Amino acid sequence: MAFASLIERQRIRLLLALLFGACGTLAFSPYDVWPAAIISLMGLQALTFNRRPLQSAAIGFCWGFGLFGSGINWVYVSIATFGGMPGPVNIFLVVLLAAYLSLYTGLFAGVLSRLWPKTTWLRVAIAAPALWQVTEFLRGWVLTGFPWLQFGYSQIDGPLKGLAPLMGVEAINFLLMMVSGLLALALVKRNWRPLVVAVVLFALPFPLRYIRWFTPQPEKTIQVSMVQGDIPQSLKWDEGQLLNTLKIYYNATAPLMGKSSLIIWPESAITDLEINQQPFLKALDGELRDKGSSLVTGIVDARLNKQNRYDTYNTIITLGKGAPYSYESADRYNKNHLVPFGEFVPLESILRPLAPFFDLPMSSFSRGPYIQPPLSANGIELTAAICYEIILGEQVRDNFRPDTDYLLTISNDAWFGKSIGPWQHFQMARMRALELARPLLRSTNNGITAVIGPQGEIQAMIPQFTREVLTTNVTPTTGLTPYARTGNWPLWVLTALFGFAAVLMSLRQRRK
């Protein structure tokens, strides 16, 4: 009785919400304890039972603050190291980001208790998953979005991974919320029926993991080499280091020419404008073509626009076998989804003078088109994404083509040091390979550089913070997963049906 009385206190529930939210971080890499996702979501739902809407909103906010405060604290590393501001200000900015993201979980909990106040099957199994899908969409869309720490990613090695090629990672989010709600209902009501339904729902997708939505093409197997330059972020944009950086990448690449069909350098490996490096690029292109290899590299490009100003792009270009390199070549990719404050500054004229954090190197990029053709290198078709873009499942899928041989992502996670951020980023990249059933080539400055198989499995990788080359044979695949064909539309239809049913049934119950 004493415990029952204690748990009814709002302050205790707020504290528990913080703890359950923080527990959710364990579901993601590098911890990979996927049951933590269910425990965390179950805690969120259970703590909002029998609460008024404002109380539930506060619980949802505290839960979100626990999740994001522990799960994205890696942002502090880049702010503290490169932001040029006092320690208390750095901490405040991280707290502010976590608090902002927590508004969406607070919105979820508050609306859920406002529209479906009773602790029923309707609330946990129908209303909650649909509402969660909407609030998670808003978190990934408003102010360019930040869809980090979606619990579906915890299943990349879990029992529900087979659902990803069928309906995408967001469908796993949906099912996890439903299962967690039913478990919370079973616990609070001490009723075995919701428990049985939860177990059945959780088990149903398990056989899907054994379906192969792709066909390997062993006759097209190639040797791929990815150069991990391990250039310290503090030196990366130092003009005096440019020549040394080029030497590091060239010296690692020269022995690979004629052996590896495809060589990959990471994001902005060439830390200079493309137009300034024409002699180097043309000489390297000629050497690669002579030896039958191709190179894909990150670089910075600046083009004069119609207003007679320069647009600067975070770019991928190709060199080597095939048509000679040309600055006018369309065989390039310009990053579309830019990171706020890292690659562009909102309210630039106001914020830039305030602190060095708002004036970081290369923080004035322009956007490339949302849809861009695949890169072609040595007859290989590559659907590309730069850094942050790989976490945007729908955008990667929209750029995917049936003739894509591989997914390609290049990145520079040196901003975040030895934190958990790069591992979470890597986990999300793996999900893209699983959703689209294509091998994924991930080349980074200091890790995690890896080859991911078409079922999201790690085929080869090299350690972080080392100057190494990952060389391995990779077999392309063909075939389209249901998710590749339809995207998130089936899930949104399901969300609309669940939402409509939840509202209709709630209205009927109130009339009785």
From Swiss-Prot:
<feature type="transmembrane region" description="Helical">
    <location>
        <begin position="194"/>
        <end position="214"/>
    </location>
</feature>
<comment type="similarity">
    <text>Belongs to the CN hydrolase family. Apolipoprotein N-acyltransferase subfamily.</text>
</comment>
<feature type="transmembrane region" description="Helical">
    <location>
        <begin position="487"/>
        <end position="507"/>
    </location>
</feature>
<dbReference type="GO" id="GO:0042158">
    <property type="term" value="P:lipoprotein biosynthetic process"/>
</dbReference>
<feature type="transmembrane region" description="Helical">
    <location>
        <begin position="57"/>
        <end position="77"/>
    </location>
</feature>
<feature type="active site" description="Nucleophile">
    <location>
        <position position="387"/>
    </location>
</feature>
<protein>
    <recommendedName>
        <fullName>Apolipoprotein N-acyltransferase</fullName>
        <ecNumber>2.3.1.269</ecNumber>
    </recommendedName>
</protein>
<dbReference type="GO" id="GO:0016410">
    <property type="term" value="F:N-acyltransferase activity"/>
</dbReference>
<dbReference type="Pfam" id="PF00795">
    <property type="entry name" value="CN_hydrolase"/>
</dbReference>
<dbReference type="Pfam" id="PF20154">
    <property type="entry name" value="LNT_N"/>
</dbReference>
<dbReference type="GO" id="GO:0005886">
    <property type="term" value="C:plasma membrane"/>
</dbReference>
<feature type="domain" description="CN hydrolase">
    <location>
        <begin position="227"/>
        <end position="476"/>
    </location>
</feature>
<feature type="transmembrane region" description="Helical">
    <location>
        <begin position="168"/>
        <end position="188"/>
    </location>
</feature>
<keyword id="KW-0808">Transferase</keyword>
<dbReference type="InterPro" id="IPR036526">
    <property type="entry name" value="C-N_Hydrolase_sf"/>
</dbReference>
<keyword id="KW-0472">Membrane</keyword>
<comment type="pathway">
    <text>Protein modification; lipoprotein biosynthesis (N-acyl transfer).</text>
</comment>
<feature type="active site" description="Proton acceptor">
    <location>
        <position position="267"/>
    </location>
</feature>
<keyword id="KW-0997">Cell inner membrane</keyword>
<feature type="transmembrane region" description="Helical">
    <location>
        <begin position="91"/>
        <end position="111"/>
    </location>
</feature>
<feature type="transmembrane region" description="Helical">
    <location>
        <begin position="14"/>
        <end position="34"/>
    </location>
</feature>
<keyword id="KW-1003">Cell membrane</keyword>
<keyword id="KW-0012">Acyltransferase</keyword>
<keyword id="KW-0812">Transmembrane</keyword>
<dbReference type="InterPro" id="IPR003010">
    <property type="entry name" value="C-N_Hydrolase"/>
</dbReference>
<keyword id="KW-1133">Transmembrane helix</keyword>
<dbReference type="InterPro" id="IPR045378">
    <property type="entry name" value="LNT_N"/>
</dbReference>
<dbReference type="InterPro" id="IPR004563">
    <property type="entry name" value="Apolipo_AcylTrfase"/>
</dbReference>
<feature type="active site">
    <location>
        <position position="335"/>
    </location>
</feature>
<comment type="function">
    <text>Catalyzes the phospholipid dependent N-acylation of the N-terminal cysteine of apolipoprotein, the last step in lipoprotein maturation.</text>
</comment>
